[in-house]
Amino acid sequence: MSEVVYGGGDSLELDALAVYSHPDDAELTCAGTLLKLKSQGRLTGVVDVTRGEMGTRGTPEQRFEEAREAARLLRLDVRVNLDQPDGHVFVTDEARTALVRVIRTYRPKVILTAHWDDPHPDHAATARLAREAARLASMRRYDEAAGQGAAPVPALAHAAYSRLVAPSFIVDVSEFVEEKLRAILAHRSQFYDPSSKEPVTRISDEGFLKQLESRWRYAGSLIDVAAGEAYYVREALNVEDPVELLTRPMNIYS
């Protein structure tokens, strides 16, 4: 059953909603974008599809509190957990209905999510779940008994993490790197701790955050800034002012 982790409110309509599989996924992937949007006065939220209970480190209870603290640091307007089974995320009718209800409640203009070719099965399934729920939320007779009414179809932007995915756009997050790191490290059970007796995982390895920062720097270098977050949009982008778009800073060697 879905649970509000932080914030909320029935009349809240979001500009951007990040939909990711596990607590900490949104922080690792799009925290800079969420922070930038907040600095512009936008309303933002996160959906964690699972509680991360299959993770090697930390308990679901710890991860719940860490997600709440990270939401505070990101200044989110709402954070929701869909309570789907970790390691078993599939595009089921139950999962679609749960996410449709969140979309109809908060009516986001944009959904940020994983890419459907992500090597983690939960991440790939979450990308497909987000796409299907975004469309179904606009269908008046889908889950009609819940009494919510249809919502406009939000645009979807997928994280462009792999070298095989060419970004459609990159967000300059140079000003928000330190805040992003603080939000990531709010999930303290998951990352490097020299005193921890728990098994070492890829993300708890001492060098993981440096590797992550290298990715942000690389994405930033493609648009000639210090740090960036890259996204892929499957649909063609409708550009109102090509001069404004094409005269923004970019790296001609990218």
PLM segments and residue spans:
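Metal-dependent de-N-acetylase/amidase catalytic core
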Residues: 1-17, 90-254
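Active-site rim/loop-helix segments in enzyme catalytic domains that contact anionic ligands
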Residues: 1-106, 244-249
